[in-house]
C-alpha cells in the first residue's frame, strides 16, 4: 500500500504532544485468555466473522467430523500491520521508527546519500517510484540506518521507540497498539492446538520485540523482512571464510528481502515447511499468502481479511475497504468489519483525535 511519506514525517514531529497511555497495557494484552469453546469479549454479539471463525474451528477439531484436521497440520499464519496492530498512526511501526532515526535521533548523523534516498521516499511520485521500488528502497535505507548496530542495542532501540504515543489516537502507546479482538483470535487458536506464525512485512527483529510478551510465540514463529547479521569484526569478509571470534558480537548488516506478497509464500514454505490451513491479513500484500493457503490443500481452509472501515475509532479507508471486501467475496474469504464486528479496538479509553 502506497504511503503518504510526508504525512508520516509531520506526524512524527507531533509525537511529543500526546498524553499518558490509558489503553490495555502489555500485561493486560498478554493476559487475554480465550477458552477452547470461544468465550470472546471484544467482539460484537453475533458478529458474522467471529461466528465463521468458531464454526470452522469446531468443525476441524471434531474427531467425528469429515473436516477434522490433526493437530500437526493446524497451522495458522497472520499478517501483523493492519491485521493485529495499528498501521494508521499514520503508518507502519517499522517506517515510523526509520523516520525517527533519520529526523529525530541526535545520537548519529545519516549520510548525505541516505538523506537523498529518504527524500526520494518522501516524494515517490516526483521521482517516479512505484510501490515495489519504494518497498525495495525503504528496505535498503532502513538497513543502512541501523548498519553496524548490535542485536542487543537494536532490540533496545525498538523497545524505546515503542514507548512513543500513537499519532491521532489518545491514550495509546505504540507498544499497546494491538487490536484486542485479534489478540483474542490468537489465544483462541492456541487453545485449540494451532501452531500460529506471524508472517509480516515488518523487520523480523523489530517484530520479535513488539510481539514478545504479547503472544505466546517462540522467536522462530515470527517471520518478517530480513536484514543480514554479521560479526562485528567481519569487515566485509565472506561468511564462508570468516571464523566467528570470541570477542565478536552480532551486528546488523545489509538488507536481504522484503517479506510481502509472493515472498510471504516463499518464506512460509522455507521456514514453516507446511501449508497453512488458516490465514489472516488485511491487504493485497497478503493475497498470495491467502491463495497459497487455499490452493490444492488437502484440508478444509479458512481465510479472514480485515476491512479498514472504521472511521470513528480508527483511520479507516472506505475505498480500500470496499476493494478488499470485493476481493473477499470473489475468493471465498471471510471479511472482518472492524466497524461492525469489533466491540472495541484498543479499549474504550482510546479515542480518535481530530
Briefly describe each language-model feature range.
Residues 74-89, 290:
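Asp-based phosphoryl-transfer active-site loop
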Residues 47, 148, 262:
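Electropositive phosphate-/nucleotide-binding environments in soluble metabolic enzymes
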Residues 24-44, 58, 66, 73, ...:
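C-terminal cap/substrate-recognition subdomain and adjoining C-terminal extension
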Residues 5, 11-12, 19-80, 95, ...:
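Non-catalytic pre-domain segments flanking phosphatase-related domains
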Residues 1-2:
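N-terminal secretory signal peptides that target proteins for export/translocation
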Residues 89-92, 96-176, 180:
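A metal-dependent, Asp-based hydrolase signature
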Residues 6, 11, 16-17, 86, ...:
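Generic recognition of cysteine residues
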Residues 63, 85-87, 231-232:
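Short, solvent-exposed loop/turn elements at domain surfaces
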Amino acid at each position: 500500500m502506497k504511503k503518504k511519506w510526508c504525512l508520516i514525517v509531520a506526524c512524527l514531529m507531533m509525537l511529543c504532544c500526546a498524553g499518558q497511555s490509558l489503553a490495555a497495557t502489555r500485561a493486560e494484552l498478554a493476559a487475554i485468555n480465550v477458552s477452547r469453546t470461544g468465550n470472546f469479549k471484544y467482539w460484537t454479539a453475533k458478529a458474522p466473522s467471529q461466528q465463521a471463525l468458531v464454526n470452522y474451528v469446531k468443525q476441524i477439531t471434531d474427531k467425528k467430523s469429515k473436516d477434522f484436521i490433526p493437530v500437526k497440520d493446524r497451522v495458522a499464519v497472520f499478517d501483523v500491520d493492519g491485521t493485529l496492530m495499528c498501521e494508521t498512526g499514520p503508518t507502519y511501526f517499522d517506517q515510523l521508527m526509520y523516520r525517527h532515526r533519520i529526523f529525530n535521533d541526535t545520537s548519529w548523523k545519516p549520510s548525505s546519500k541516505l538523506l537523498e534516498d529518504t527524500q526520494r521516499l518522501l516524494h515517490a511520485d516526483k521521482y517516479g517510484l512505484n510501490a515495489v521500488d519504494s518497498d525495495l528502497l525503504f528496505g535498503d535505507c532502513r538497513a543502512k540506518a541501523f548498519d553496524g548496530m548490535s542485536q542487543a542495542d537494536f532490540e533496545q532501540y525498538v523497545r524505546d521507540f515503542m514507548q512513543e504515543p500513537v499519532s491521532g489516537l489518545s491514550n495509546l502507546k505504540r507498544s499497546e497498539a494491538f487490536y484486542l479482538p485479534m489478540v483474542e483470535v490468537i489465544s483462541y487458536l492456541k487453545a485449540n492446538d494451532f501452531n500460529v506464525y506471524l508472517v509480516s512485512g515488518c523487520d523480523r527483529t523489530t517484530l520479535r520485540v513488539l510481539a514478545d510478551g504479547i503472544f505466546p510465540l517462540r522467536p522462530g514463529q515470527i517471520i518478517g523482512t530480513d536484514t543480514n547479521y554479521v560479526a562485528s569484526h567481519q569487515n566485509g569478509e565472506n561468511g564462508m571464510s570468516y571464523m566467528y571470534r570470541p570477542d565478536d558480537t552480532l551486528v546488523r548488516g545489509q538488507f536481504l528481502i522484503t517479506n510481502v506478497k509472493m515472498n510471504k509464500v516463499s518464506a512460509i514454505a522455507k521456514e514453516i515447511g507446511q501449508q497453512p490451513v488458516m490465514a489472516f491479513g488485511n491487504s493485497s500484500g497478503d493475497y498470495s499468502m491467502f491463495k497459497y493457503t487455499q490452493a490444492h490443500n488437502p484440508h478444509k481452509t479458512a481465510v479472514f481479511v480485515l476491512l479498514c472501515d472504521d472511521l470513528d475509532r480508527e483511520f479507516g479507508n472506505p475505498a480500500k475497504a470496499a476493494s478488499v471486501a470485493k476481493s473477499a467475496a470473489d475468493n471465498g474469504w471471510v471479511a472482518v468489519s472492524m466497524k461492525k464486528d469489533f466491540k472495541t479496538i484498543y479499549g474504550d479509553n482510546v479515542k480518535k483525535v481530530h
